[in-house]
Every structure is written in C-alpha cells, then in structure tokens.
C-alpha cells in the first residue's frame, strides 16, 4: 500500500529528541529519511542512558525508527561534495543545531537555495528572534520559559516540570506539521521555504489555557481554582493549581483502594454539571441535589474541597478500575492514573499499534511507542532504528547515483570515517 509521504526525501541533521521526533513521524508516514551522523560516534543519544553495554540505547532507538543512517564528515572536502549532492536530491533538510551552525558549515539559506530552490529547510531552535535567541535550550528549560512550569505544581510549592516531553517532542510535532504544510504550498509555488519552530513557542502553545486564565484574572478571581473556595486572594499572575482541571469543569485526582501501597492507585474525577445528580446518587449524597450550597455549579465553587473530600471517601472503597466502570456507566467523566507498566502491558494499545514490539539486531526485542496518528489509507509499520552508517553505501549508490569507483574514492578521502588524529611530533 502506498504511504502518505512516499516520494518525499528528508535530509535529517537532527539529534537528541526534538528533531528526531519530527523526522521519525515523517518516516512513519512514508518519507525516506536519511539521517546524517558524525563518523565514529553518531547521534550522541546512541550512547546515553545505555541499559545494555555497547549497543544503541533505547533513547536513540525509540526516536529513530524507519530511518536510514549515513556517516559523513562535513568538514572534509569530499564530504561537502556529498552533502551538496544530497541537498540537490532531497526535498527537506531538518536540523536542530545551535544557532548559526548550518551557516558555519558553509550552507546558508542562500547557498541551499542556489543548490536546490525547492528545498525546504526546517529548524528547531530554543527561542525565536529576541533577547534569548542565542541561548541553548533543553526540555526543562523550554518548559520553564514557555509558561508550563510556573503553572504546574501546587500553590504553596515550587514550580514543577511535567514528565511529558512537551518541549522536545512537542516542538518536534509542531515542526512536522510545518514541514507538511510547506510541502503542500510548494505544490502551488514551486519554491522551498524556511520553517522554524521555537521550543519556547511550542510550550506556550500547549499552555494556551493558562494564557487564557492570565487574561481572565483582570476581570476577577479564577473561580474554578481551589484557592477561590479557600478564600485565598489571587495575585497578578496565573497561580499553580495542583490537579484542578484546566477546562472550567472542577476536577481532582483522588485516592482509590490500595493507595497506601500502590503509588498509582488514584483516579481523576470531574464534577461535570450535567451529571451532578448522578454523582450525588453514586456517592450517596442525594440531598445535595437540592441543597442550596451544592445544587448549582456557582454554589458548588466555594465548597469544592468538601465535595471532593466526600467523593474521595467513596473512591477509596473501590479500585481505580472498579470506580471507572461504575462512573462510566453513568457518563461521569473520569480516568484512572495508569503507570508506564500498565500502559506497556495494555493489550488494546498493542492492538492499535500505539505500543509496538521492535526487534533490533544488537539489543533484541524492545517496546516503543508507535505512530499516535492513524491513517486509514497509510498504516504505519514501525521498523527498527538504523545502525550507525548502516546505509551509507546504499544512499551513495541509490540516491546519488555514484558508481563503485566513485564510492571507493569517497571512502579513500576519509569523508565517511572519523577524522584521523595527528600524532604528536
């Protein structure tokens, strides 16, 4: 079956997480992604957080499925020739270097356009133009500078970062959408363009409900936040609100049966207005249906702590799955707190390809996330990540059309091997 991005060729200069997230998604949709790596070492994540000595780490394998790997010394004159040929033969160049690195390699935007006017150059940076544009950014820095950390945590505690990689992986997903959009526009214009996604911008985009709340503060307190019911004044910035729902419907994480020994024996419970009477029936507080302190959403706002304390008395008598079954039967919105172990073992996620088992020649079988986006006419087959330089000769021959003699010359030039160290005189 034809894949959605069949015929699109990506020159992948990305490393670590943000860029590889982007290019892996494009590869899952069928693009031919050629990952260019430093001879001898490759992507730094091959050796980071290794659980098995001398094999590619899960950090690398889970971000580089469905790609081809070539090694290339871009400082070598022959290596520059190969890179020029690749730029001429590809549709998109993706990079997440530090500011100015691509220019210092001799491949400015103008130079790339001269080589291939249809080339799309896609970049992930830490910040957009401004006072911080030259700063180095990693996941947690992005969360802190994009508004996520200041609004995550409890009101009386420090800012917290989330376990979800919204800075790295989130920005990679944003960039992938930008690339596909640029490819579509190129069909009409015939021209390439630059696509940039800044990590600060990506985090702020995912934190947009907090920017919403920042503006609401000018008109009064945020009544769905716990501190309103506790009578605590609001300041001039959106506060941290613990596990309060961000969607305007009061919600909290509540203990379930077994919480004393199971750190994930919890459920998220939302007191949605249309099912309030059903909630009252479930927890045995039928009198709350008509009580003036509880009967209407505005009246309940000042009593949320008491309401959730009573609901928690009920949830603590049930496992999180028992509670979920009961609540779902009444359309009461809730969700169990699922551990990574539970997710890895969930047969429904295996069946949909959301969690996949991949076989690797040196590390054996391992689990990975699959494509979270399902296309009916372009199903994803997750293939293992490449070994370092595994496809170098294949790409030189099939993509660039070099013959055996030319490939041998490139090898002899040292363009595909680690730079030789000069012996001390």
From Swiss-Prot:
E.C. numbers: 2.8.3.16
Q: Which residues bind CoA?
A: 17-18, 38, 72-75, 96-98, 104, 136-139
In terms of superkingdom, the source organism counts as: Bacteria
Which pathway does UniProt place it in?
Metabolic intermediate degradation; oxalate degradation; CO(2) and formate from oxalate: step 1/2
Question: At which positions is substrate bound?
Answer: 247-249
Q: Which GO terms describe its molecular function?
A: formyl-CoA transferase activity
Q: Entry's Pfam families?
A: CoA_transf_3 (PF02515)
Read off the SUPFAM superfamilies from this record.
CoA-transferase family III (CaiB/BaiF) (SSF89796)
* TM annotation in the entry: none
Q: Name one GO biological process term.
A: oxalate catabolic process
User: Catalytic activity annotated for this protein?
Assistant: formyl-CoA + oxalate = oxalyl-CoA + formate
Please name the catalytic residues of this protein: 168 (nucleophile)
State the UniProt keywords alphabetically. Transferase
Cysteine pairs bridged by disulfides in the record: none
Membership in a protein family: Belongs to the CoA-transferase III family. Frc subfamily.
Q: Which NCBIfam families does the UniProt record give?
A: oxalate_frc, PRK05398.1
Subunit field text: Homodimer.
Q: What does this protein do?
A: Involved in the catabolism of oxalate and in the adapatation to low pH via the induction of the oxalate-dependent acid tolerance response (ATR). Catalyzes the transfer of the CoA moiety from formyl-CoA to oxalate.
Protein name as catalogued: Formyl-CoA:oxalate CoA-transferase
Q: What is the lineage of its organism?
A: Bacteria, Pseudomonadati, Pseudomonadota, Alphaproteobacteria, Hyphomicrobiales
Q: Which gene encodes it?
A: frc
